[in-house]
Amino acid sequence: MCDEDVAALVVDNGSGMCKAGFAGDDAPRAVFPSIVGRPRHQGVMVGMGQKDSYVGDEAQSKRGILTLKYPIEHGIVTNWDDMEKIWHHTFYNELRVAPEEHPVLLTEAPLNPKANREKMTQIMFETFNTPAMYVAIQAVLSLYASGRTTGIVLDSGDGVTHTVPIYEGYALPHAIMRLDLAGRDLTDYLMKILTERGYSFTTTAEREIVRDIKEKLCYVALDFEQEMHTAATSSSLEKSYELPDGQVITIGNERFRCPEAVFQPSFLGMESAGIHETTYNSIMKCDVDIRKDLYANTVLSGGSTMFPGIADRMQKEITALAPPTMKIKIIAPPERKYSVWIGGSILASLSTFQQMWISKQEYDESGPSIVHRKCF
């Protein structure tokens, strides 16, 4: 279908960040916030060549005069006009390519509604005139990136967490679990517990600082109660962090109390099961004959699985839930923050994949519903 010399574009649209680049590369060229900002008041920026909307980093830096919107909520696109702006920005400003010259591989959340897949397909062919496109499930791409076709993926990003069992390259929809608890909630929780310590973080700018503290200093305790005891009786776990204004703050048990919420959602006032139990529940919804393969191939993916100690803790928790003789292996690839994108880069450059693309011709003949026949 497509010439060998034209690289496919791979775009992974997350709730928090958009990752984009060229198939065959080992990392995305562009990573920017999935936000669209519009001026709060017309004419505030007279003479500044004011645009009617800003995307990504530019929206982030001008947020004082803008109203910011996230078009992707909990992994699912909810605002198509803004989503179109993000894609336009991706192609023309970040990658600087003409989308009508490249096949485009997009990613979607597990259990993405059918209408959404059709809308994505329609926008790619009708607005951007792409010659070919494909929609792949994010967790499946992460599994490919780890060199597997069977396993269970715990994918936790900024807006949503999923556990997705995959057998021979196909996600098993009946066993997919979704948990609306992810990076954004952990940042909010850290803001809250730092406020209890007497530090005030309230504005969106301060929220970015807290996110940085979370990414640099937080970790998952192997034994939460014991870690709390250690923190209470010594200062060995305390770390200091310098704020942009030069003030230095000290953070102690908050370092592991924050990510503990993914194992104990009750910390956030949520009634759901933690990620370990959710993973176990997903496995138990699968055929008894494939469970062994899932336990032995549990792959972590997404930015919110980057906490040090999370793999060991998962190993411990799942071992406690699983049958006693079961072999359990948690795989935490170092590049897992971008493993969805990397899996897409691998998939789109496989020679065997080239016949899988939906071509413009097929789209013109069948319409948007073609996506359900060709992407599964």
From Swiss-Prot:
UniProt modified residues of type Methionine (R)-sulfoxide: M45, M48
SMART domains cross-referenced by the UniProt entry: ACTIN (SM00268)
Positions of modified residues (N6-methyllysine): K85
Keyword annotations of the record: Acetylation, ATP-binding, Cytoplasm, Cytoskeleton, Hydrolase, Methylation, Nucleotide-binding, Oxidation
Annotated organism of origin: Biomphalaria pfeifferi
Modification type N-acetylaspartate: residues: D3
Residue positions where Tele-methylhistidine is found in the record: H74
Protein name: Actin, cytoplasmic
One Pfam assignment: Actin
Main location group: cytoplasm
PTM section of the record: Oxidation of Met-45 and Met-48 by MICALs (MICAL1, MICAL2 or MICAL3) to form methionine sulfoxide promotes actin filament depolymerization. MICAL1 and MICAL2 produce the (R)-S-oxide form. The (R)-S-oxide form is reverted by MSRB1 and MSRB2, which promotes actin repolymerization.
GO MF terms, alphabetically ordered: ATP binding; hydrolase activity
EC number assigned by the record: 3.6.4.-
Catalytic activity entry: ATP + H2O = ADP + phosphate + H(+)
Gene3D superfamilies in the cross-refs: 3.30.420.40, Actin, Chain A, domain 4
Residues that bear N-acetylcysteine: C2
